[in-house]
Amino acid sequence: MKKITAVILTLILLFSITALSAAQLNELPPSAENIPAPPEINAKYALLLDLQTNTVLYEKQADIQMSPASLTKIMTALLVAESGIALDTVVTVSNKAVNVPSGSSILGLSAGDQISILDLLYGLMLRSGNDAACALAEAVSGSVESFVELMNSRAAELGMNNTHFVNPHGFADSSHYTTARDMAICSCEYIKYELLNTIASSASYEINLTSKEGSQKTFRISNTNPLLTDSQYGNYVTGLKTGFTQLAGNCIIIRYQREGRDLLSLIFNSPQGYRDNDAVALANYGYTQFSTIDLARIFQERSVVITVQNCSTEDEHNGQLELQMSSAAPLITQPQPPQPTE
């Protein structure tokens, strides 16, 4: 009786916690007077994720398909890291890699340049070089086309069900789209790699390459994310990426780490001049208005004991049941049906 009761109580408690976590990920809790209102966000699409619990704290049109612009490069960098290619591998830049669409942001590569995978990754994430994206794609998969197939395959594996890529850099294309929720999934994979975190949080980096003629070339690039060096928030913001096209508007994903909190703020299609304020306002909302409670740790520090009436006289614990708890990490999202492009 004692063991059966303990198992039932534990299962009920675990089921309740798991069900709550899954529900929180896909819809906001009902409004209540004691839940502070979120800040006014100018962005058309947004999402705030607590990385410690994988809980969505705020969302705005998070499942509507839209253009991600250069935030696409988060997936590109992730696939380079997952490929296992050595960082000191030297790539010879092809004519095709530098033949990017007019108006692209570029690292400034020339055909025949020789440059390491590591420097290409910095050029991808800091300068947002479309030429660096294509050079990396060719290094990993042999061609941009094959790499794009890998991007879509990996997106499907991750459950990014409203995403389709047509290039490795995010230059505007009506067939190249994702959602705020899908990019949160991708970003969560990205930050699992220490190197990628280091790159995304770097304010600047010195690029070294060898030209086709054999001359050495060195130049310093700066991160397009101004929040990394912001006097007020620079100590808390660690990446990840900015993006802009006329179609996508102003986009940014930031990781906000402050006093034990770890948040991901995703902003898409924000009006000119509002992007960074939107990202920080959303992150601060999560930091100031929510807190994380570890129920498993609380139970470890102060156990709950239940007394069972009419227990067996042979029970060495005299009918005393100690309730224990274990926790399981919830999924960031449940599979979402395709949503139309707005």
Language-model region placement:
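Domain-terminus/edge residues, biased toward the C-terminal soluble/receptor-binding domains
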Residues: 160-164, 172-342
